[in-house]
Amino acid sequence: MISVAAAVEIIQAHWPNFGDTTMDVDGSYGRVLAESIEADRDYPPGDRVMMDGVALAWSEYHQGRRHFKLLGTVAAGTPQSSLPDQTGCLEVMTGALLPQNCDLVIPYEEVAIADNQVKIINPRQREPGEFVHPKASDCRAGKVILESSSKLNGPAWNIITSFGKTKVRVKQKPRIQIISTGDELVEITQKPKIHQLRRSNIYGLQVSLQSRGFQNVNLTHLADDKEVIIRHYQKAKLEYRVLIYSGGISKGKFDYLPEVWSQLGVTKYIHGVAQKPGKPMYFGIDHRSKTVIIGLPGNPISSLVCLHRYFLDSAPIYAQLTTDFTFKKDLTYFLPVKLSHTPQAVIKAEPLPVKNSGEFIALAGSDGFLELPQHQASFQAGECFPFYAW
């Protein structure tokens, strides 16, 4: 078996590029840019007023003038105006272009206005450019404002729409099929007999993928029949770029999948990781059809943990154990936990250990899992470890 770190490195090294596509900005939330975005103009395009108040010439204020005649009002969204007399001032609104001949804005809170006269009631020292957002201080036209591979979250949307982008080039998300296997599984609409289980695993995997922006996820089921598995694979590899199998990858008599994949020319990169749960995990590539093959254990906790740890591109945060915990096997252990936060902004992780990887009901109160390192048996309260959220 290989280590968790080695498995991560192998998957990252062999994960294919699924290409890119152009789409409307409206539907691009959460996608990853496949192009760099450049500013189409200076930003701000002109000196911009940052506070409602009055605009005036700093030189007059610096020379001691504290009373100014009010000569007009400038609203946001109007062409740039000009101050005709430097002994006067103009009312200006946030977002307006700073009038010509003005280089100082004084907020309403620091002036008194009566009978078209403005009195400065806070005669403090001021500098030119106060409450002014200078032209091109954020960026010049032509500057790259979002790098390729940036994720299109809320701030990124603000940026690209501010510069007139209505369509963006993004990395293509693959078509995915999740395949449950096993003669013991029945539809969730059926009432299972005592020797049967509802095939719930794949729904947990599906919503986990959908929560990360993978919307094109199909579900199907296969019996423990080698010929059925072969026929399905030969068709599915042409329709989907990623095939995720749940179950059928261990050493049981009816665990045909690794044998079938080898027979059909899949290149195996991983089969067995020194971890609990999820030890039998499989990863391979069919290089002829460029299809990714992911084999997850059939136990619910194992499949969810492996998906989140290796295939959802999740960056961990670090959380602190609330109590001592012991795990004596020489394996990386993924420990379900419930998070809480202290007033000092410390993230605490309360262990919710399970008896076995089929005890999925115990996950109901958990927020995710800690990754406890291999070659360590005792983990002390207060120690910090990587946390992955469901």
UniProtKB/Swiss-Prot annotation:
GO molecular-function term, one example from the UniProt record: molybdopterin molybdotransferase activity
GO annotation (BP), single: Mo-molybdopterin cofactor biosynthetic process
Pathway annotation from the record: Cofactor biosynthesis; molybdopterin biosynthesis
Cofactor binding remark: Binds 1 Mg(2+) ion per subunit.
Catalyzed chemical reaction(s): adenylyl-molybdopterin + molybdate = Mo-molybdopterin + AMP + H(+)
Top EC class for this record: transferase
Keywords noted in UniProt: Magnesium, Metal-binding, Molybdenum, Molybdenum cofactor biosynthesis, Transferase
Segment forming the signal sequence: none
Domain of life: Bacteria
EC number: 2.10.1.1
UniProt xrefs under CDD domains: MoeA (cd00887)
InterPro entries named among the record's database cross-references: MoaB/Mog-like_dom_sf, MoaB/Mog_dom, MoCF_biosynth_CS, MoeA-like, MoeA_C_domain_IV, MoeA_C_domain_IV_sf, MoeA_linker/N, MoeA_linker/N_sf
A GO cellular component entry from the record: cytoplasm
Cofactor requirements of the protein: Mg(2+)
Pfam families referenced in this protein's UniProt entry, alphabetically: MoCF_biosynth, MoeA_C, MoeA_N
Similarity-based family: Belongs to the MoeA family.
Protein role: Catalyzes the insertion of molybdate into adenylated molybdopterin with the concomitant release of AMP.
The name this protein goes by in its record: Molybdopterin molybdenumtransferase
Organism: Synechocystis sp. (strain ATCC 27184 / PCC 6803 / Kazusa)
Name of the gene encoding the protein in the UniProt record: moeA
